[in-house]
Amino acid sequence: MFQQLNCTNISSLLFLVSLLGIFLNQKNILVMLMSLEMMFLSISFNLIFSSIRLDDIIGQIFSLLILTVAAAESSIGLAILVIYYRIRSTITVELMNLMKG
């Protein structure tokens, strides 16, 4: 019981740290992307430990699906970020509204 509460607290702490990273660092898009990935990781962490506690495999499968989608989202986001850096030579968020498309 104590171990389950401890894992839930760790997952909640990871989620809150990633929210704090997004809200405090709104100028660097790379840090915001890393904080978003940490959010996905904390949600997956919570799903895995909840499914272990409930002795259900569905949470673990869903967690694997979340991690797969997060990896694809991360690679697409980094590719867009590299192209944006080559064009503007900066990765600040202030100039993002100048993008055409």
From Swiss-Prot:
Name a single GO biological process: ATP synthesis coupled electron transport
**One short Pfam family name for this protein?**
Oxidored_q2
Q: Does the keyword Transmembrane helix apply?
A: yes
For molecular function, the Gene Ontology terms on record are: NADH dehydrogenase (ubiquinone) activity
Q: Name where it's found.
A: Mitochondrion membrane
* Function field: Core subunit of the mitochondrial membrane respiratory chain NADH dehydrogenase (Complex I) that is believed to belong to the minimal assembly required for catalysis. Complex I functions in the transfer of electrons from NADH to the respiratory chain. The immediate electron acceptor for the enzyme is believed to be ubiquinone.
PANTHER family reported for this sequence: NADH-UBIQUINONE OXIDOREDUCTASE CHAIN 4L (PTHR11434:SF16), NADH-UBIQUINONE OXIDOREDUCTASE SUBUNIT ND4L (PTHR11434)
Q: What is this protein called?
A: NADH-ubiquinone oxidoreductase chain 4L
In its UniProt entry, the species of origin is given as: Chondrus crispus
What lineage, starting at the top, does this entry show? Eukaryota, Rhodophyta, Florideophyceae, Rhodymeniophycidae, Gigartinales
